[in-house]
């Protein structure tokens, strides 16, 4: 677990967040859907998973974690964290937790979207 962030760490996170959100918008807005699949979202989630995993598995310094993992990738995609944590469960031999994590994330996120969708239609 990372220690509590100071103002410099928060600046790195905020700067990274600006970069990640800008990249996500740029990529997602320029890619067409492929057979109804939002290719932009799929692309940023896939790339984010790769980059987050590469940085996490390589034990980068805290400043890189704040800027890239939390800042850039946190706003670029949250799926990268989900993918990494789910893979880690499998790697650690926690097979039931691996499948349960996938199930709960997918179902709860879809449920949340459904709740918001129907709440806005009332």
UniProtKB/Swiss-Prot annotation:
**Keywords, A to Z?**
Cell membrane, Ion channel, Ion transport, Membrane, Metal-binding, Sodium, Transmembrane, Transmembrane helix, Transport
Tell me, what's a Pfam family for it?
Answer: CRCB
Compartments (UniProt record): Cell membrane
Presence of keyword Transmembrane: yes
Q: How does it sit in the membrane?
A: Multi-pass membrane protein
Residues reported in the UniProt entry to bind Na(+): 74, 77
Residue intervals passing through the bilayer = 1-21, 37-57, 64-84, 98-118
Regulation of activity = Na(+) is not transported, but it plays an essential structural role and its presence is essential for fluoride channel function.
* Family the entry assigns: Belongs to the fluoride channel Fluc/FEX (TC 1.A.43) family.
Under PANTHER family, the record lists: FLUORIDE EXPORT PROTEIN 1-RELATED (PTHR28259:SF1)
Known HAMAP family for this protein?
FluC
Q: What is this protein called?
A: Fluoride-specific ion channel FluC 1
Q: What does the record give as the organism's lineage?
A: Archaea, Methanobacteriati, Methanobacteriota, Stenosarchaea group, Methanomicrobia
UniProt gene name: fluC1
């Amino acid at each position: 677990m990372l220690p509590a962030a100071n103002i410099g760490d928060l600046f790195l996170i905020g700067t990274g967040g600006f970069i990640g959100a800008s990249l996500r918008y740029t990529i997602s807005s320029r890619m067409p859907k492929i057979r109804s699949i939002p290719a932009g979202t799929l692309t940023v989630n896939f790339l984010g998973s790769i980059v987050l995993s590469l940085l996490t598995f390589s034990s980068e310094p805290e400043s890189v974690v704040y800027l890239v993992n939390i800042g850039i990738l946190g706003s670029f995609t949250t799926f990268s964290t989900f993918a990494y944590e789910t893979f880690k469960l499998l790697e650690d031999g926690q097979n039931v937790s691996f499948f349960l994590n996938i199930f709960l994330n997918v179902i709860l996120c879809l449920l949340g979207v459904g709740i918001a969708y129907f709440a806005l239609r009332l």
